[in-house]
Amino acid sequence: MNGPVRTEPLHGEIPLLASSGSYSVVVLLRGYAEPQGAGDAVRADGTVTLVLPRGWASDSSRGLAPSADGGSKTALEEAVRGPILVDTGGPWARGALLEALATQGVAPEDVTLVVGTHGHSDHIGNLGLFPEAALLVSHDFCLPEGLYLPHGLCETQPLILGSGLQVWATPGHGGQRDVSVVVEGTSLGTVVVAGDVFERLGDEDSWQALSEDPVAQQRSRERILSVADVVVPGHGAPFRVVRETVKSSEDLICEGKAVA
C-alpha cells in the first residue's frame, strides 16, 4: 500500500516532452521567481506548457465555432482537437513564447484552447495572441467572440476534456478559482500542470506567504500529490513525485517476518 510521498528533481532539458497514446505534454518555457535587490521585489514569469493531441497536424484544427446547441460539452470536445496551451507567461515573454511554439510547429492560430491556471499577469499575460482559441481562465470558459458557457467544474467534479485529460479545481494560491491540468498515461506517468499550487520543488517554506487561502491550497497540494508522477510547477523545473511503499501485516507474514 502507499506510504509517505516525497519529491525529487526530474532531470531533463526544456522543452520537456512526455508522450502518451492520446496527448503529448511539452514544457515550453520554465517559470522562475528571482529576488531583486535588498527589498521584496521579485522578477518572475510563469511556466508555459503545451498539450498536443496525438496525430495533430497544423491547419487541421482551425475554425473553432460555437456548438450548435450552445452546450459546453460539445464545445469542449471541439476545443481539445488542436493544441492546448496551459498558461501563457507574461507579456514581456511574448517573443520567447512565439519562438517556443514555432519550435513545436505550432502557430498562434493553431491553438484551440488556452487554459489559464489563475488570473495573475505572469500566467495569462499573452492571451491576446490567441483570439481564435477557446479560453478556460480559472473557472470561466468562453469561445471565440466571447460566448461564455457553463460547465460545472468544482473540487468534487473535474472537467473532462478527453480520454486521460482533465481540468481540476485546485483553489488556494490565487483564491477559490485556480485550476490545474491533469494528463494521464504519459511516458512519465500522470503529469499535473499545477500553476502556482506548487511554486517549485522544495517550496514548503514559502508557498503559504503567497497564498490567498493556505488551507484550500494545502488541500489542493495533497490532492495533486496523491495522483501525480510528475508536477509542472508555476515557477521552477518539473519534479517527480515518489510514493514509498509500506508493506501490510499480511505481506510481512507471507515473507515470514514477525508482526508485533
Curated annotation (Swiss-Prot):
Compartments where found: Cytoplasm, Cytosol; Nucleus
GO CC annotation: cytoplasm; cytosol; nucleus
Binding residue positions for Zn(2+) 2: D122, H123, D196, H235
Keywords for this protein: Cytoplasm, Hydrolase, Metal-binding, Nucleus, Zinc
Highest taxon listed in the record's lineage: Eukaryota
GO terms of molecular function: metal ion binding; RNA endonuclease activity
Cofactor binding summary note: Binds 2 Zn(2+) ions per subunit.
Amino acids binding Zn(2+) 1: H118, H120, H173, D196
Required cofactor(s): Zn(2+)
Catalytic function, reaction form: a ribonucleotidyl-ribonucleotide-RNA + H2O = a 3'-end ribonucleotide-RNA + a 5'-end 5'-phospho-ribonucleoside-RNA + H(+)
EC assignment: 3.1.27.-
Gene Ontology process terms (BP): histone mRNA metabolic process; mRNA 3'-end processing; positive regulation of G1/S transition of mitotic cell cycle
Matching PANTHER family: METALLO-BETA-LACTAMASE DOMAIN-CONTAINING PROTEIN 1 (PTHR23200:SF48)
Domain notes: Contains four of the five characteristic MBL-fold metal-binding motifs, with two waters completing metal coordination.
Sequence similarity: Belongs to the metallo-beta-lactamase superfamily. Glyoxalase II family.
Quaternary data: Homodimer.
Record's function text: Endoribonuclease that catalyzes the hydrolysis of histone-coding pre-mRNA 3'-end. Involved in histone pre-mRNA processing during the S-phase of the cell cycle, which is required for entering/progressing through S-phase. Cleaves histone pre-mRNA at a major and a minor cleavage site after the 5'-ACCCA-3' and the 5'-ACCCACA-3' sequence, respectively, and located downstream of the stem-loop. May require the presence of the HDE element located at the histone pre-RNA 3'-end to avoid non-specific cleavage.
Name of this chain's protein: Metallo-beta-lactamase domain-containing protein 1
Protein species of origin: Mus musculus (Mouse)
